[in-house]
Amino acid sequence: MGKAILDPKEIPAKMDKDKIVNEPYTIDGEEYNITCVSMGNPHCVVFIKGDIDNLELDEIGPKFENDKLFPERVNTEFVKVLDDHTIKMRVWERGSGETWACGTGACAAAVAACENGFCNKGDDITVKLKGGDLVINYTDETVYMTGEAEKVFEGTVEV
C-alpha cells in the first residue's frame, strides 16, 4: 500500500508538530486523542475504549470530516484494540459516510495502533471490519495489506 506518512504538512493536518500521535484534540466540546496518518489520502484515527458497535458514527463522523484541522477533509477511523494483534474498526469516509470497509483506513488504523504502542511494527495485525477482515503489516519501509475478495453485487447497465 506504500509508505505511511506521519508528517502533518503532508497529510494535511493544520497542527504544528512533527507528527500527530495520541494528541488531545477537542471536537464539538468533547476531547479525543487522535493519531493522523496519510496513506495517499488523509486519515484521523481515534481509539475507543467503550462499545464501538453502538458508536453514533452518523453524528460524530461528519464533525471530524469537516473540522478546521483538516483542510482537505478527513477519513476517520474509530478503533477498539482487542489484543496486540487484533483491532476492530468502523470508518467514516469523507464524502461517503460510514462504509463497511476501507483498505487505506485499515492500514492507517494499524499504523496508528503501532505508533501508539498497542501493536508491534512488523507483526501481522488483523483489522476487523463490517465487510470482513484485513491483515495489515506495517514496517519502516511500507504497509502491506492482505484480505479476501468477495463478490457482493452483479448487475447490468444499459447505455
Question: What does each model-identified segment do?
Answer:
Residues 1-100, 111-159:
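Active-site proximal loop and beta-alpha junction motif in alpha/beta enzyme cores
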